[in-house]
Swiss-Prot record:
Transcription factor that specifically binds AT-rich DNA sequences related to the nuclear matrix attachment regions (MARs). InterPro entries: AHL15-29, PPC_dom. One of its GO terms (molecular function) is minor groove of adenine-thymine-rich DNA binding. Keywords: DNA-binding, Nucleus, Transcription, Transcription regulation. Its main location: nucleus. Residues 7-18 have a biased composition (Basic residues). The keyword Nucleus applies. It comes from Arabidopsis thaliana (Mouse-ear cress). This is AT-hook motif nuclear-localized protein 28. Residues 5-17 bind DNA. Residues 27-173 form the PPC domain. One of its GO terms (cellular component) is nucleus. It comes from the Eukaryota. Pfam families: PCC.
Amino acid sequence: METVGRPRGRPRGSKNKPKAPIFVTIDPPMSPYILEVPSGNDVVEALNRFCRGKAIGFCVLSGSGSVADVTLRQPSPAAPGSTITFHGKFDLLSVSATFLPPLPPTSLSPPVSNFFTVSLAGPQGKVIGGFVAGPLVAAGTVYFVATSFKNPSYHRLPATEEEQRNSAEGEEEGQSPPVSGGGGESMYVGGSDVIWDPNAKAPSPY
């Protein structure tokens, strides 16, 4: 009686069975956003709160719409922390802003901070601009185009001894004032008149 043994190895075709595909989701390093801020809201605080909620950094590329009652940081040679407030309605011409993402506890904070700069067109085509140092309230629906980023790396670029010496001298003469700060002045822009209010209160920091 002849005995037939089982063939050795795997059954024919077993190696060629299709395998389920493996998908790996990788978040892009930068993502575009279009954001809408309704009238009556502080656009700076709205963007800052959005970044904190998503734990991301943000770079605002452009904006459109109108805002009211803007407080700007006065440039040098004004006293550090000096601000000026413009009352009225203004159209956004350009926006440049950066909100840094939250850093890990072990990371050293880079010597930079969040900033928000604007160029605005007021009545009669007058243009003002600078670093925002207080609330920036939307006078209508405001739109922003921005991109997000995470885990930025900080690098200090090489500098010559002369550049370092000039930088140290500039810091001794006076540094740029902080974004929020002290006593400010107030301007009311309406039509072609500009009215100064020397008794204006200091704006609250955002």
